[in-house]
Amino acid sequence: GNEEYIKILKKNFPKNFNLEGLKIVIDCANGAGYKAGPKLLESLGAKVFAIGIKPNGLNINKNCGSTFPNKIKSAVKKYNAHIGISLDGDADRVIMCDERGSIIDGDQIIAALAIRWKNKKMLRGGIIGTLMSNYGLEKFFKLNQIKFIRANVGDRYVKEKMQKNNFNLGGEQS
């Protein structure tokens, strides 16, 4: 079950990718990612501090997860972590914060991944954003010669455009 899923998830990372030396807090929102999230990060070598990992069927997203970012911000400071990752209950959204507990905007996450993947020759085609993506993000991609296409708002539409254009990176701010 879970071990097989971790192996599948790890295939999305470059060979020999690791998080050794990083302290990461992950808030799993008492939801779907409560086992796989921490295990994936640990399997990549990170020192993991997991919160929101006690689902009881009623407490999903309750005062935790990506809809309650203050929890991850304070946990990052408490554990002196390098980064905080906060999932929503079904683990399809993420909010991140830096080592100071400052929230990292979704467009910033996409931009950082795009540049990193471009430099490592991992980016395929370009980026899919949405109609709500910041215009500054579009300008940033143009400046860095990365193709940028907007989709309607919603992960379904982002995924459709990614598949249609054979792109391997896309997302929206939420």
Residue ranges and their predicted role:
Residues 1-7, 11, 99-171:
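Proline/glycine-rich low-complexity loops and linkers
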Residues 1-77:
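Gly/Ser/Thr-enriched, mixed-charge loops and adjacent short helices
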Residues 30, 89-93, 101, 133:
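Short, glycine/acidic-enriched loop or turn micro-motifs at the edges of active sites
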Residues 51, 89-95, 138-142, 169-174:
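Short acidic (Asp/Glu) and glycine-rich catalytic loops that position anionic groups and cofactors
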Residues 69, 80, 85:
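Gly/His-enriched, cation/cofactor- and phosphate-binding structural elements
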Residues 79-81, 166-167:
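Short, high-confidence coil segments that cap the C-terminus of an alpha-helix
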